[in-house]
UniProtKB/Swiss-Prot annotation:
Binding partners and assembly: Component of the cytochrome c oxidase (complex IV, CIV), a multisubunit enzyme composed of a catalytic core of 3 subunits and seevral supernumerary subunits. The complex exists as a monomer or a dimer and forms supercomplexes (SCs) in the inner mitochondrial membrane with ubiquinol-cytochrome c oxidoreductase (cytochrome b-c1 complex, complex III, CIII).
Organism the protein comes from: Dictyostelium discoideum (Social amoeba)
GO cellular component, one term: mitochondrial inner membrane
Mitochondrial intermembrane membrane side: 54-93
The protein, known as: Cytochrome c oxidase polypeptide 6, mitochondrial
Lineage, top ranks: Eukaryota, Amoebozoa, Evosea, Eumycetozoa, Dictyostelia
Task of the protein: Component of the cytochrome c oxidase, the last enzyme in the mitochondrial electron transport chain which drives oxidative phosphorylation. The respiratory chain contains 3 multisubunit complexes succinate dehydrogenase (complex II, CII), ubiquinol-cytochrome c oxidoreductase (cytochrome b-c1 complex, complex III, CIII) and cytochrome c oxidase (complex IV, CIV), that cooperate to transfer electrons derived from NADH and succinate to molecular oxygen, creating an electrochemical gradient over the inner membrane that drives transmembrane transport and the ATP synthase.
GO molecular function terms attached to this record: oxidoreductase activity
Keywords: Membrane, Mitochondrion, Mitochondrion inner membrane, Oxidoreductase, Transmembrane, Transmembrane helix
Pathway(s) the chain acts in: Energy metabolism; oxidative phosphorylation
Family, per entry: Belongs to the cytochrome c oxidase IV family.
Organism superkingdom: Eukaryota
């Protein structure tokens, strides 16, 4: 019985049983490897997204942002907003 391929006949003599009959099963043909990879990628991205969302929601304030700093910032904001150059005319609203 000839396979039609001379290099195959030279490499694997008649009766050679080193490889299974169905090479596709050996290589994983028919198994959902693509789906498993996709599930792994989605799971990794989901876990990392949840982790970073949690770390962003649990951010500590800066050590310099104390009560005095907040009060001065609010006073500056009120002073800036009171400046008429920042006020839109009523007809533009």
């Amino acid at each position: 019985m000839s396979t039609g391929n001379e290099s195959y006949n030279l490499r694997y003599p008649k009766g050679f049983k080193g490889y299974p009959y169905n090479m596709y099963k050996l290589e994983g043909y028919g198994t959902p490897k693509g789906y498993i990879t996709l599930i792994g990628v989605v799971a990794t991205l989901t876990v990392s997204g949840l982790f970073f969302a949690k770390t962003r929601s649990n951010k500590r304030e800066y050590p310099t942002h104390n009560k005095e700093w907040r009060a001065k910032t609010l006073a500056y904001a009120k002073e800036t907003n009171a400046d008429p150059i920042y006020q839109l005319p009523k007809d533009k609203i």
